Every structure is written in C-alpha cells, then in structure tokens.
C-alpha cells in the first residue's frame, strides 16, 4: 500500500467558499477514480502558525494505482484549481502496511 499526503496553504485573499469548494472537489475524487482505496480530506482545526489550511490523505494499493490517480483527468482539474488558490503545496508519498512503519495507538 502507498499513502499519499498533500497539504495546502491558501492565499490570504481566498474566500472561505472557494476553500470549501476545493475540499469538496478533493473529497469527490474517491467516487470517480477507482484506484483510490481510501481518502480523507479536511481543514486544519488547530490553526497554529506552522499549520497549513487543508490536507488530504489517500491510500492506494500500489505505485501503479497512485500513478493512475496522478494522471487522471479529474485529478488534474482539481490540481489546477488548488494551485491557482494556494501559496504553498507540499506532498509526501510513502509505503504503508509493510516495512519499517509504526502504528501507535493511544
């Protein structure tokens, strides 16, 4: 399994309705891209100085599934929308469920 994480810091002048539309469009990707095993998206709740504004965590069966998602036309539309309203975007993709990973339960 591969876990894909993306975080967005929106431009200061971007209205809340536009931010909500971005998150809604991200969440809708799971219904139209079959390679998505699971997807969670939402807004930052702590609002600390170091915080980004929203984030996405998606899980894919393998690298081929993640690559198919990456080039899917619906994903590319949302990527363009997100870039247009963001001052910063960061992402990381890592293998999950095998190898040197840890799960911590409290």
Segments the model singles out, each with a brief description of its role:
Residues 1-53, 61-71, 94-106:
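Short S/T/G/P-rich N-terminal loop/turn motif that feeds into the first structured element of a domain
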Residues 70, 79-82:
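Short, flexible helix/strand-to-coil boundary loops that buttress conserved ligand/catalytic motifs
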């Amino acid at each position: 399994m591969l876990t894909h994480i993306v975080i967005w810091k929106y431009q200061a002048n971007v209205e809340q309705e536009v931010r909500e539309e971005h998150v809604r469009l991200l969440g809708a990707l799971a219904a139209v891209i079959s390679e998505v095993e699971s997807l969670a998206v939402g807004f930052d709740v702590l609002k600390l100085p170091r915080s980004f504004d929203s984030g996405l965590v998606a899980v894919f069966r393998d690298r081929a599934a993640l690559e198919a998602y990456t080039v899917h036309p619906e994903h590319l539309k949302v990527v363009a929308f997100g870039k247009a309203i963001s001052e910063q975007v960061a992402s990381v993709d890592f293998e999950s469920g095998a190898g040197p990973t840890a799960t911590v339960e409290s």
